[in-house]
From Swiss-Prot:
Mo-molybdopterin binds at Q204, F235, A508. Pathway: Purine metabolism; hypoxanthine degradation; urate from hypoxanthine: step 1/2; Purine metabolism; hypoxanthine degradation; urate from hypoxanthine: step 2/2. It comes from Bacillus subtilis (strain 168). This is Probable xanthine dehydrogenase subunit D. It holds the Pfam family MoCoBD_1.
Length: 745
């Protein structure tokens, strides 16, 4: 069905469009200093010495810190704390921090960095997984250059290939991508009288930041307050610590608030990126199109440090067969340390890379078999009660068939290839599935609180962050629908560890789903408290009262009996819940329990003179349960598609010898409004009978299927297959030339 639920203005909408909303990097405090971080001059080197005397003596400089100033663990990392806060004896990439300065102005702090003398001894740069995996390669970490291995096997792959009539093998290469959020990493650390501090900085998990910072500063977590919302975009890039340790070190040393706001160049050098991957797939099928064997090898460049590299690889391995049943499968993944930029959490979380390779591979295999690409998928699509992709138990779902059937009817796919001289058009489609939550048996706690404030507002408190994804709108909509109150009756508190319960991370397409689950648990006891108090106040029977706009109303007449403000005068009232994200009963096997499904159909235009590829038309079909916030749902899918468009056609954070080729957006192009056409969206809200898990997340699913769909459409237009992203104009022109379609001399 098409979304027909009315849209609402987001709670933060007015503040954003008027510019009145204050982001963390907009904040200032009395006596505030400005901080800068000295990053490594080399991608790989020993640190012989560091001298900060000249910087310390510079007028206007109030604090300089090195690793000697870190009171606790001089390491950070969400899962594996392997990245130095401030390097002691070695740097492993150009984003490594060596020292930090706080001064009266940003210009003075910048100048002071130039006065810090660092003597290096350069080391060989491991700038590719191939180089880092050589037998004699220098070890980047004590345990070697392999961060993580992941493996899954089912059936007998070799027997499957022997039984196949057609076997096809190909290698696909995926690029490093920048998050390019509008607000680069930044914030303010404010020292407190008890020896702790308040950190105002964008993050996707305030409580996790608090845990890491407490470990670094060797102080109780309760002495650290994290205020993390709102922020101007994240997409996974602010899930890990960035400027927080440096601002806090400088604030505690100087005794004054310290603000650090990275320039785009600083963000590029130090920030997390999407994992580059090289994926080799070998697939066998019989003459009817039944997939019999599937062998996948994944090599991921995780850069200098771990962050969430292991989880990204696990996710790719889990989704290596996508929404298809293949009896014989073997998937091997390896994540390799290099001296390149750190790769980690990024919208799609490894699903983008493996889905491009898989879906493109199936399109090519269908051509060899002489079978329609969508028919090949239909023959092998997962059934509602099949086990999950790792042969684990999951919530029964027919989402894969739903999106396949919906996108098969797209008017886009009814168009035929068109030759308009030097402009040729083609169409393509692809489907995908995406696990929600952390998965793999990992701790995935959630929670929330409903309370009645002294002002008479129903206050919904969650430990989530507003990254621009619309969690505020989702909370408001769910509370309105489940409690029957009006938007004016609601107050929302998020992004402040001093005020909210633990809800887990604002990642993994889990936020909206967890809010829905929390309110399901909270509404009955919370309403019971409201009704009991209202009955005592009014003399009415609690059974005859229902919540509504402004207060409790008579169930029959709908007349207002008592306002929320009047109920609040009797004292505080609250209910809190804590629970876990739904997980598979097979945590040893791993994988996710809830999945969203998506499909995309596209039309592209290829310029035979320039090699340009333009997206002309696009339609999405998404199966992710009930729609909570229509404009938020659509925004996630369309915004995700725009991000995927950049990944497919233009974005690559190239590195040579461990250095970025582009350190600003004047040389790293992302899609503009003219690159993105109007998009159609089919939201499939139906869940299987007995499904009690409500809405699934859609924050990532829109970024995935569009890439292989575009690649298929390019082939439909000019007959050339693309194995490497982003699509290179030069390589496409060479392929066009080989096809005899050359339009120039």
């Amino acid at each position: 069905m098409i979304i027909n639920k009315p849209s609402r203005v987001r709670p933060d909408g007015r503040g954003k469009v008027t510019g009145e909303l204050k982001y963390m990097t907009d904040l200032s405090f009395p006596g505030m200093l400005y901080g800068k971080v000295l990053r490594s001059a080399y991608p790989h080197a020993e640190i012989v010495s560091v001298c900060t005397i000249k910087a310390e003596k510079m007028e206007g400089v109030q604090a300089v810190v090195t690793h000697k100033d870190v009171p606790g663990l001089n390491r950070f990392g969400i899962v594996i704390p392997d990245q130095p806060v401030l390097c002691e004896d070695r740097v492993r990439y150009v984003g490594d921090a060596i020292a930090a300065v706080a001064a009266e102005t940003e210009e003075i702090a910048e100048a002071a960095l130039e006065l810090i003398q660092v003597e290096y001894k350069e080391l060989e740069v491991m700038d590719s997984p191939e180089k880092a995996l050589r037998p004699n390669a220098q070890r980047l970490h004590e345990d070697g250059n392999i961060l993580h291995r992941a493996f899954f096997s089912n059936g007998d792959v070799e027997e499957g290939f022997q039984a196949s009539d057609t076997v096809f093998e190909e290698t696909y290469e995926l690029p490093r991508q920048m998050h390019t959020y509008m607000e680069t990493e930044g914030g303010v650390a404010v020292p407190e009288d008890d020896g702790g501090f308040t950190m105002y900085a964008g993050t996707q998990h305030g409580y996790k930041d608090r845990f890491q910072l407490a470990r670094i500063f060797d102080i109780p977590e309760e002495k650290i307050r994290i205020v993390s919302s709102p922020m101007g975009g994240s997409f996974g890039g602010k899930d890990e610590l960035n400027i927080q340790p440096y601002a806090a070190l400088l604030a505690l040393k100087s005794g004054r608030p310290v603000k650090i706001h990275q320039t785009r160049k600083e963000s590029v050098r130090s920030g997390i990126k999407r994992h580059p991957m090289k994926i080799t797939i070998k697939t066998g099928a019989d003459h009817s199109g039944n997939l019999l064997a599937h062998d996948v090898k994944i090599v991921a460049d995780t850069g200098a440090y771990a962050t969430l590299g292991p989880a990204v690889l696990d996710f790719s391995v889990e989704h290596a067969a996508g929404p298809y049943r293949i009896p014989n499968i073997r998937t091997e993944g390896i994540s390799v340390f290099t001296n390149n930029g750190v790769a980690g959490e990024f919208r799609g979380f490894g699903g983008n890379q493996i889905t491009f390779a898989l879906e493109t591979h199936l399109d090519r295999l269908s051509g060899m078999l002489g079978i329609d690409p969508l028919e090949l998928r239909r023959k092998n699509i997962r059934k509602p009660h099949d086990l999950g992709p790792l042969e684990h138990r999951i919530a029964p779902t027919d989402g894969a068939a739903q999106v396949l059937n919906a996108i098969s009817k797209s008017p886009i796919l009814k168009k035929t290839s068109r030759n308009c001289g030097y402009l040729q058009r083609g169409t393509g489609a692809a489907i995908t599935m995406h696990g929600g939550g952390l998965g793999f048996g990992r701790m995935d706690a959630a929670g929330g609180r409903l309370s009645l404030s002294s002002e008479g507002k129903i206050t919904a408190s969650f430990g989530f962050e507003e990254c621009g994804q619309g969690i505020l709108a989702a909370i408001e909509q769910i509370v309105m629908e489940e409690l029957g109150c009006a938007a004016e009756d609601i107050s929302i508190v998020i992004g402040d560890t001093a005020k909210v319960p633990k809800s887990g991370s604002s990642t993994a397409s889990r936020g909206t789903s967890m809010v829905w689950h929390a309110i399901q648990r909270l509404k009955k006891p919370f309403l019971a408290q409201l009704k009991k108090r209202a009955a005592e106040w009014s003399g009415c029977s609690a059974e005859n009262l229902i919540p509504g706009a402004a207060g409790l109303r008579d169930k029959n007449t709908k007349a207002l009996v008592v306002t929320y403000k009047e109920l609040a005068e009797k004292g505080p009232l609250a209910e809190e819940t804590a629970f876990d994200f739904p997980t598979t009963p097979d945590p040893v096997v791993g994988g996710h329990f809830l999945y969203s499904f998506g499909a995309a159909a596209v039309e592209v235009e290829v310029d035979l003179l320039t090699g340009d590829v333009k997206l002309i038309d696009c339609e999405h079909a998404i199966a992710a349960g009930p729609v909570v916030s229509p404009q938020g749902y659509r925004g996630q899918i369309e915004g995700g598609a725009a991000m995927a468009l950049g990944y497919t056609l233009m974005e690559e954070a190239k590195m040579t010898d461990g250095r970025y080729a582009a350190e600003n957006l004047d040389h790293y192009l992302i899609p503009g409004i003219k690159d993105v056409p109007d998009m159609k969206l089919i939201a499939i809200e139906d869940l299987m009978k007995g499904d009690v898990y409500g809405p699934r997340g859609v924050g990532e699913i829109g970024t995935i299927a569009i890439t292989p769909a575009i690649v298929k459409a390019v082939h439909d237009a000019v007959g050339c297959w693309i194995n490497k992203l982003p699509i290179s104009r030069e390589e496409l022109l060479e392929a066009i030339d080989r096809k005899g379609l050359k339009q120039w001399t």
